């Protein structure tokens, strides 16, 4: 049976100064992974409203499979403001559809046929979605890549949620600011960046830890290996979705059998390109996608 790369969690609309654009880390991730020839699916929940209809329509138009049951809450929206460098701050609405993702038979079937799943901390702010994410992860095959793209937002996370997620994942994706927050949360703020990463990798027996540091480059740590890549200098339109495109490209490359350093190099190039485009889900040029398509 065909196996899927799954983005699991929040489906929402980023309300930017120039208008609303479909976003949410899981859909962004799944969309970018799908551009490399992998079957991908976004799993979330939508409201029984016009925005829910528009979400399904837009994902269909992008050719992205989605499992998003309709629930009795509004489809998620996020107010996004960009600073002079295109870096976003978020006003995330609460009590929305993706806070109530049900573990339906179709969602469970996606877990059983999953080659990689990416999830974050934001959708775990509510009990129902947190339980669905845990059940999904526990139902995946043994060889599934379980990527915790931590995505700390505001105060929508707890130490317990982070620890449980680290126990369930085998790859952690984190940025430098989040690493500082986690160091503070877990009581090892004195260590330098690299030692914090090695400590987390060993403590939670992770296969890989991916650290992005904005314009200061990015790292991949694995047992016996450290990869570093400079961040290319580009004309930034906005950075919304850039991290998700990095994770999507990296995951697709690893599943295609690429070595870690090669997967890392591709992810950096893809992420830099997405920064030059408006919105989180631009179409990627073939010079990127052709590198790992069969």
Pin down the residues of each PLM region.
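Conserved phosphate-binding/catalytic region of the ribokinase-like
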Residues: 1-4, 186, 190-294
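Structural alpha-helical scaffold elements that stabilize or flank donor/cofactor-binding regions
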Residues: 109-110, 164-165, 202
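Glycine-rich phosphate/adenosyl-contacting loop at the front of the ribokinase-like
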Residues: 1-64, 78, 236-237
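Conserved N-terminal subdomain of the carbohydrate kinase-like
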Residues: 39-121, 142, 291-294
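Conserved beta-alpha-beta core of the PfkB/ribokinase-like small-molecule kinase fold
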Residues: 116, 120-195
